[in-house]
């Protein structure tokens, strides 16, 4: 099953690294929520897997998320691509 296998955060750079198990050639969407209820916001979509595992780095300030006390992430398979 799809699951996040790596989460790393740097306070200095405001970067978060997300890694997950993936299927070669599949596409994925990374979504975020501030309340675990609303998952309408994408960090990125149409991410093509890197193979059996995939990871991406995001700068939270690029999305206005660096000042929030908590942010939650999830990865979904993008079956539209």
Question: Where in the sequence are the language-model features?
Answer:
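Short, composition-biased motifs enriched in small/polar/acidic residues
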Residues: 1-81
């Amino acid at each position: 099953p799809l699951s996040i296998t790596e989460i790393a955060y740097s306070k200095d750079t405001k970067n978060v690294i997300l890694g997950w198990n993936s299927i070669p050639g599949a596409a994925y969407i990374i979504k975020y929520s501030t309340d675990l209820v609303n998952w309408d916001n994408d960090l990125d979509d149409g991410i093509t897997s890197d193979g059996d595992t995939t990871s991406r780095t995001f700068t939270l300030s690029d999305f206005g998320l660096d000042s929030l006390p908590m942010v939650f992430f999830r990865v979904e398979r993008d079956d539209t691509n």
